[in-house]
Amino acid sequence: MRIRRNDFGVLTPPELGTWEPTMTVTVVIPAHDCQETLDLTLAALSAQTYPSHLLDVIVVDDGSDPPIEAAGEIVRVRESWGRAAAVQAGLEAATGEVVLVLDADMVPHPEHVEAHLRWHHLAPYLVVLGWIDFTQPPSPPTPAEVAAGVRDLFPMSSHRHDWAEEIIGEHDGLRSAPSSLVSRVHVGATASYPAWLLRACGGMDASLKLAEDTELGYRLTQAGAVFVPDPEARAWHLGLPTAMRSVAELKRYNDPFVADRVPYRRYLRADQGRQWLVPYVDAVVEAGSYEDVRASVDGLLAGSLPDVRVTITGPWEWLTDSRRSPLADPLLDLRLLHAQFTHDPRVRLADPPPGVAPFRLICPPGWMPGHDSVERLVERLEETDGGVLCVALAETPDGVVTARLERTAALSRAALVIRPGEVLDDVLDEVFGVEWVDGADFGFTRRPRLYPPRRRPVPEHERLARQREQELSRLRERAAALRAEVTQLRREAAKGRRDTARWKEKAEQWRREAVRLARERNHTVLTRAVRRVRSLTFPDR
């Protein structure tokens, strides 16, 4: 069965209690100084609906004092300590086709193992996550009470894995979650894995004392796993975990370890110029002409994304110190590349790297990515959650010259499901998606004819930065001139307002004077008219 990205909705698990299991499962329980809760965990496992002849349990005693006691198989960790080391010891001893890791403070419902295993019968690369209900009982039940019935034994706590349930709910039960997010819900308190897949990706990192689930979830993603949370695989968690009791302290402890190992947590890698144990992008350049390879590597290392490691592949074992003509050496280009990059910690002279980084960029020698080319390509692939970006660089008589940005999770998934005779890119397109883009649109250019140039050309990002600075300077000058002009206009406007007020006052004076004069004139005219009338009427007077 082929699953696209994390969309396990193409699978239809059987209803609980209606199917016939065939796969074997080993339940691994890491335990440290927790005999009382472990007894309840084991009692709940004794009452599982999954066939007992297909289920075995391994308790791993992580240095308990007094030592843990249990009826079944016990593995005691002596050379290391911590939960990761305990789970790894249990994995090494496990014989089941599936390994279900269950913490010693978990009390699973009777259908818990069955709910996990019904998925594993459908596809061989699923990681199934149980559903946790927290409880803080005033007094724990006895193992006999647990074996008799788990579902209603405990009062439900108000605490939940809100952040995980929110991610699951917002992404259609995790089916539409992007690759960079999906493994965040990997909580190892109840999780099951194909044993072969867990071993193939390296098992637990025993050097980690906390955050081991986060780191393992990341590596499982790169191995091509599909994560399936099943709300019917329920279990009680007795008490609150450290993640809920000491949030700030746990984050402070985990951040540097997670930052070094999980490139997806970009917010933890905000430090400029830092290098990390696991790079964000593994770039691969095949050895060839010294000038071509150097130009490509220089472009990759000078990019805006510093979280890049470059591997130059070639027959490095051919380089010996036997006598030769230095200038006529048939391996001269290879030797020059070795001399140029052997002491650069960001460059490896080796075979192609294993799939640990989330992205791999294959760049043909002689082609130089621009300052932000790699960063923009990764952003494009993350936006679409695609599997491969094929970057068309040039067309030649031999075909199209391309660079490729590949998602490691997509390559691993395709390798798991490809059939003989199939074309890899066809399978990649089916399980994640393949997209073609124009290299010129992403800043790829052919190297200069002379490389390295005697005078280094100004990098594009510096040229653009200077251009922007010049434009800003011009705009600042223009803004200053406009401010001065506005100030002058304000002054003139204020003067205009004063003049207007003065002229209004004069106009009012003139109006009053005109009224007065008009009245006087009218009075004079009237007086004359009266006199004229009188003289005409009374001529003798």
Regions found by a protein language model. Name each.
Residues 111-160, 368-403:
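Conserved donor NDP-sugar-binding/catalytic core segment of glycosyltransferases
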Residues 43-54, 298-307:
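Short, acidic, metal-binding catalytic loop of nucleotide-sugar glycosyltransferases
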Residues 452-541:
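Boundary detector for helix-to-coil junctions that initiate low-complexity/charged tails
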Residues 156-192, 387-388, 396-403, 407-430:
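A recurrent flexible, glycine/aromatic-enriched loop bordering the glycosyltransferase active site
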Residues 99, 360-362:
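Short aromatic/hydrophobic "clamp" motif used to bind/position activated sugar donors
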Residues 61-68, 106, 314-329:
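A conserved acidic beta->alpha catalytic loop
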